[in-house]
A protein has these predicted regions:
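Conserved active-site and SAM-binding loop architecture
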Residues: 1-174
C-alpha cells in the first residue's frame, strides 16, 4: 500500500497508524502521473471543496461565501486513468452541486465513483453520518486531527467510510 500526502503532519500520523504502508510526502497528482503504471490498483480522491454541495448550498447560497471555480483535477485524473492505466482504478469525490462532467460508474453513500470495474450496490449500517458529532466518532479521525483543516468534522464527513472502501477494494481484487 502506498499513500501520497501533501501535508507532512498528516503523513507522519498516517505512517504511525499504518507502519506497513509506504508514505510519500508530495503532490499526489504529480506522483500519479509519474507512477501510475507501477500499481495493480489505484484509488485517488482529488480535493473536493470546490465541487461539494455543502459549500455551494450552505456556504455560497446560505452564508454568502464567494464562489470558487471547481478544481478540474478531478476530471483530469478520470480521463488520464481511462486512457493510460492498465490496472484497476477508482476516482472518488463527493456529490457535486452541478451535473458531473463525466458520468460516474457508481454512487454509494455521499460519494460518486469513477472506475474501470464493477462494484455491486450495497447499503452500510454507518451510512448516516449526520449523527456523528465528535471527531473521535469517525474512522480516520487521528489523521484529520493532525491536519490544519479548520473544520475537521466536515472533512471527516467527506471521507469514505472504511467498510465502503473495503467493499470497493474487494471488488477491484476479484
Amino acid at each position: 500500500m502506498t499513500a501520497v500526502e501533501y501535508s507532512p503532519e498528516i503523513a507522519k500520523v498516517y505512517a504511525q497508524l499504518y507502519p506497513q504502508d509506504t508514505v510519500v510526502v508530495g503532490d499526489a497528482v504529480a506522483y500519479l502521473e509519474a507512477h501510475y503504471a507501477e500499481f495493480d490498483f489505484i484509488w485517488t480522491s482529488p480535493p473536493c471543496p470546490s465541487h461539494g454541495q455543502y459549500r455551494h448550498n450552505v456556504g455560497v447560497i446560505g452564508k454568502g461565501f464567494a464562489p470558487i471555480m471547481p478544481d478540474m483535477t478531478l476530471y483530469a485524473q478520470i480521463v488520464f486513468l481511462q486512457h493510460y492505466a492498465k490496472g484497476k482504478w477508482v476516482v472518488e469525490n463527493v456529490k457535486p452541486y452541478y451535473e458531473p462532467l463525466v458520468k460516474p460508474t457508481f454512487e454509494m453513500q455521499r460519494h460518486l465513483f469513477w472506475s474501470n470495474f464493477e462494484v455491486a450496490p450495497r447499503k452500510f449500517d454507518k451510512a448516516d453520518i449526520r449523527h456523528k458529532n465528535k471527531i473521535s466518532d469517525f474512522d480516520g479521525h487521528e489523521i484529520v486531527a493532525a491536519s490544519k483543516i479548520p473544520n475537521k468534522r466536515q472533512a471527516l464527513r467527506n471521507c469514505v467510510d472504511a467498510e465502503l472502501g473495503l467493499h470497493i477494494l474487494t471488488a477491484a481484487m476479484a
